[in-house]
């Protein structure tokens, strides 16, 4: 069964693995559309035949998902050292296995896709608000 990945403000979800001949479509990342864009599209899932039936990677802040691979996040040094935020989640695998791992805590990462045996995707990671000010 094909399923389109969900749309997201900061990155589109990956498409579900295909059945039997085509994969599910990836979700749109910049929804609603704004400029500069707030995210990138998720990748389509791979078909069952002749492929491995993998879920598509979710889009991140820096790039779209591609195949099962997640989109990159965006690096920022507001805390004094570079930290990458808002990476997309990886696509799920075919076969046995558990639910997908959750996204990175305090970095707004996407949750990873689950296996076909237990298709539950992981929750997205919590975000963080950082406020800077100049003390005089």
Roles of regions detected by a PLM:
Residues 1-136:
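Low-complexity, glycine/proline-biased repetitive segments and flexible coils/loops
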């Amino acid at each position: 069964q094909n399923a389109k990945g969900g749309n997201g403000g900061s990155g589109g979800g990956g498409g579900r693995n295909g059945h039997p001949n085509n994969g599910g479509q990836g979700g749109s990342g910049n929804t609603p559309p704004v400029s500069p864009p707030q995210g990138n599209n998720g990748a389509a899932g791979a078909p069952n035949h002749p492929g491995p039936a993998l879920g598509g990677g979710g889009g991140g802040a820096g790039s779209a998902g591609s195949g099962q691979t997640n989109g990159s996040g965006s690096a920022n040094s507001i805390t004094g050292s570079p930290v990458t935020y808002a990476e997309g989640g990886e696509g799920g695998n075919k076969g046995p296995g558990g639910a997908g791992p959750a996204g990175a805590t305090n970095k707004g990462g996407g949750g990873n896709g689950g296996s076909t045996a237990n298709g539950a995707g992981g929750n997205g990671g919590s975000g963080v608000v950082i406020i800077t000010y100049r003390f005089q």
